Amino acid sequence: MSLNYFDIMVLDCLCKINGERSGSAVFHLFKGKRSSQTIQDAGLFQTAKYFGMAAKCSRSDISASLDKLEKHSYLAPMSESDTYKVTASGAAVLRHALSERPWPVHCHGAHYQQAAGVLWKRLSLLVQVLSHKQQGSRQYIPVTKDHKTLHWVKKYLSRHTDHIEMAKSLFAMLEAHLKKIENKAAQIFVYSLTSHHRIGYTSRQLADTLKEDEWYVYIMFWASVHYFIHSLPECEDALLKDLLSDVHLDNALTESTRKTWQMVKQGFPIQRIAEIRKLKTATIEDHIVEISLHEPAFMINDYVSAEDQLQIAEFAKRMRTNKIKQIRDGLEQRFSYFQIRLALTKQVQQYD
């Protein structure tokens, strides 16, 4: 029962969480659940790169992985249900696995995965359509059934009528970008495309062909798509910009949090934002914690003083914990849960 890359992802998350969240938290992270708790945990425990990166996994997939890791003695169950500590042998296996198959450098779920899904559907369909047009073929099954994607590509092709020139531009753009990433990742990306001549390979087919772990192939594929988005700010390619022109690239915050963020920037206090938006004060506090995690320039001193931040951070460091209740009780309940959570957002590099 050897470990696959999915197991390594689970093990790495549990190592970073350090017994402070359950296996269910890993499930929600991998699924990309856009709840305040999951998004905050992703920032607090430095696991945001995994956000949404295994969206099709099931609870049984997580359970099977946890069982496997426990049977190998890489995890030790804790007294609290569904929580685990990574053992010394588990940490050693994790280090070795990540040295052999490191997480791809530009692959970041919280930053890019939502936009990457849109980009891939549009790009892969555009490649397929242009390939068939060049061969004079009108009979084929589109690579996606997604109506929004089908409509977008149809509209785009109707606005740009020189399809031969478009195909050349698309080829040049893909070639230029793929030269800048690892050869294997570029190969995986290219073989995932469907053209007039062949159907794109699945992750399993590519894993068999490349003699590689299927989950690692899957991650490397998405890493190649993420690189296109990562390079967008410096990119001068009109076609790539067009493919993402209407896609919101700042995916770290939930939509509701973005609305709160706009009001915070206008100087509204928490209570007033809650009244205007007809939301609970606790919900607005959740939003502010999210904002603090994902907006480095956001100052929290209006909510918790610099001196109080230091006290909270020093206690958390001394006790090696991010558990809010433990910190609050240890500091004799001088600070609210909100203040402690907020102070910890500025300490997210610690205690991995």
UniProtKB/Swiss-Prot annotation:
Its main location: cytoplasm. Gene3D superfamilies: ATP-dependent DNA helicase RecQ. InterPro entries: Helicase_HTH (IPR029491), YpbB-like (IPR008308). Pfam families: HTH_40 (PF14493). Keywords: Cytoplasm. It is found in: Cytoplasm, Nucleoid. GO terms for cellular component: cytoplasm; nucleoid. Interacts with RecS and SSB (ssbA); the 6 C-terminal residues of SSB are required for interaction with YpbB. The stop codon of ypbB overlaps with the start codon of recS, suggesting they are translationally coupled. This is Protein YpbB. It comes from Bacillus subtilis (strain 168). The lineage of its organism: Bacteria, Bacillati, Bacillota, Bacilli, Bacillales.
